Amino acid sequence: MKPTSGPEEARRPASDIRVFASNCSMHGLGHVFGPGSLSLRRGMWAAAVVLSVATFLYQVAERVRYYREFHHQTALDERESHRLIFPAVTLCNINPLRRSRLTPNDLHWAGSALLGLDPAEHAAFLRALGRPPAPPGFMPSPTFDMAQLYARAGHSLDDMLLDCRFRGQPCGPENFTTIFTRMGKCYTFNSGADGAELLTTTRGGMGNGLDIMLDVQQEEYLPVWRDNEETPFEVGIRVQIHSQEEPPIIDQLGLGVSPGYQTFVSCQQQQLSFLPPPWGDCSSASLNPNYEPEPSDPLGSPSPSPSPPYTLMGCRLACETRYVARKCGCRMVYMPGDVPVCSPQQYKNCAHPAIDAMLRKDSCACPNPCASTRYAKELSMVRIPSRAAARFLARKLNRSEAYIAENVLALDIFFEALNYETVEQKKAYEMSELLGDIGGQMGLFIGASLLTILEILDYLCEVFRDKVLGYFWNRQHSQRHSSTNLLQEGLGSHRTQVPHLSLGPRPPTPPCAVTKTLSASHRTCYLVTQL
């Protein structure tokens, strides 16, 4: 603040508005509240100050409103890397069960649930499979496990995988992990399960990724008995390329690869980063499939969990698991959790209808993950084998040329280049930007700063001390002064009446409770009640 000048201002209290206006660093106040009478110049300065303050407050309100809308912006960038983690690759044969592995006991328990067969059709279906009918006196097993059926009758990778190479080095079924999906028994390459080291690549282009040759075993496909959701009409495999943290939803996101073709899949890694509320709607909380929700919240909500990391597909899968577990008291084979696997009857009467109803209602509210990795893909294909190579492949694989054309496919998955894209949401308006805008508007319109605000607060404290606290102090001082005057008046009246009294000598008066010394040689005593 500016120093006080002049004897007149020096005598004024600090709470005086003129003293504050003449010393405050805020522009214009000295012209409004300065010394002198009311004039046109003072009025114009007052109008200018009021208009500037109003404009400043309006701009501050607009900036605060914009900040509270929590806008965000998306930044797209491309970065280079010397080494990239190779994605997980999940493979599923489109045919869920091999016809050669089905037994009369399987048809008795699961024929209706999986194939839509009536009991009277079992014998005809077995004949269509080329299998003998059930012997006379056939007795089904007392119990049946759907998980064991898929594990036993699903296609084996040992039979399907004809050749495997990663970065030019041989690989085999031991490099794949068995996983169950809605399509049955599947296999994942580079899953990272059980703490296995993730494979990486240091070069892009063909020959620097995964090269496999598969036999789809079309002779093992189930006959199409009737129009049923579980019986496929196509031949080939489904492939999903995904991150190791994300469970495969291959029935919805898988790519179709057909026999008789070599398919090339060029990938580019994309790292996505989204903002949590209120700037965005992402989540990093996992949904526990074993958690039993409250009746008012049947599907529950994501709850913090250190493992596994939250993914969109993982949330949907956990949501489906909880829904089926609540409706049916069991789970389907591909669903995670500790709930018992549904029986074939529960599959048919409860689990399948519950999943279909849930998908129609879109009951799972799964937000985007705050951080995720996905892979952009470009596909191309050529026919195999060529006429020149058909005889060579037939000798190498010990298969006929016709069999190779109908059952064998090749798949090459590789990175296009060792670079990756980043898609990142950022806050469009930070708190520092808000404070900077407020400071700029403050300096532009009223010529003030943060120290000016401190001066105003200091002035308000002076006003409070002088006006409010001073009022109570003066009131208390006035009451104390009135009591003193009353006491002095009482003393004066008694002192003037003493000479008119004709009292004889009396013994000395003992000391009393209230005394007032009038002189060095005489002391007068009064009772408290006389005051």
From Swiss-Prot:
Changing L531A: Loss of interaction with LIN7B. Loss of interaction with MAGI1. Loss of interaction with GOPC. GO terms for molecular function: enterobactin transmembrane transporter activity; ligand-gated sodium channel activity; pH-gated monoatomic ion channel activity; pH-gated sodium channel activity; sodium channel activity. A motif (GAS motif) lies at residues 447-449. It is found in: Cell membrane; Cytoplasm. One of its GO terms (biological process) is response to heat. It is a multi-pass membrane protein. Disulfide bonds join C92-C186, C164-C171, C282-C370, C315-C366, C319-C364, C328-C350, C330-C342. Residues 285-307 are annotated as: Disordered. PROSITE patterns: ASC. Pfam families: ASC. The keyword Transmembrane helix applies. Residues 1-43, 461-531 are cytoplasmic. It catalyses: Na(+)(in) = Na(+)(out); K(+)(in) = K(+)(out); Ca(2+)(in) = Ca(2+)(out). Its main location: membrane. The chain crosses the membrane at residues 44-61, 442-460. A motif (PDZ-binding) lies at residues 528-531. Glycans are attached at N175, N398. Residues 62-441 are extracellular. One of its GO terms (cellular component) is plasma membrane. Forms pH-gated heterotrimeric sodium channels that act as postsynaptic excitatory receptors in the nervous system. Upon extracellular acidification, these channels generate a biphasic current with a fast inactivating and a slow sustained phase. ASIC3 is more sensitive to protons and gates between closed, open, and desensitized states faster than other ASICs. Displays high selectivity for sodium ions but can also permit the permeation of other cations. As a neuronal acid sensor, probably contributes to mechanoreception, acid nociception, and heat nociception. The PDZ-binding motif mediates the interaction with PDZ-domain containing proteins including DLG4, GOPC, MAGI1 and LIN7A. This is Acid-sensing ion channel 3.
